[in-house]
Amino acid sequence: YTTLFRSKDCSKIAIRHPAWSSGVKVKKNGREIFCERSESGYILVDLDTQEINRIDLEFQMEPIVIAANRKISYDARKAAIIMGPLLYCFESIDNGSEIEELGLYAQGELETKRNSIAGKEINTIYAKGTRRRELEGDTLYGVYQEMKEDVKLTAIPYFLWNNRGEGEMKVWIPVE
């Protein structure tokens, strides 16, 4: 992100550093400068006395597993993935049918890879997870046993879901 400021009326500018960004590179008039994030979530940039200051910002974005407040009962013990300001979702086209059977290892490593969906270059996120398996045979009930298998989950930005055909989609999935 780049912006220009006239510095006749001010000597500093406060720029909001979003909580989703793990860091930010700041360049002032083409030179990288160090700026600390304040407790209130802003970085302060001293402006030069020249007429125009050019400020370039590059926010670092890493995928993060988030949880909802426990007061939101519908999402209790579930997690979602964000990267920067984007919310991600899990589609059946990538993860198979019966999305309800998926679980996410919340402490697992998240991997990103560039892909194209609907003509847009995006970051796809891959995560370790599980899929519950069905009971064998046609019986309605059986002896309980651990019926999960490890799987690699694929998440895409929410705004792009349902662009590759109809199917199931979930944002919040159970945590393993």
Give short role names for the model-derived ranges.
Residues 21-46, 65-71:
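Solvent-exposed beta-strand/loop surfaces of large extracellular or lumenal domains
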Residues 1-4:
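Short, small-residue-biased leader/transition segments that mark boundaries at the very start
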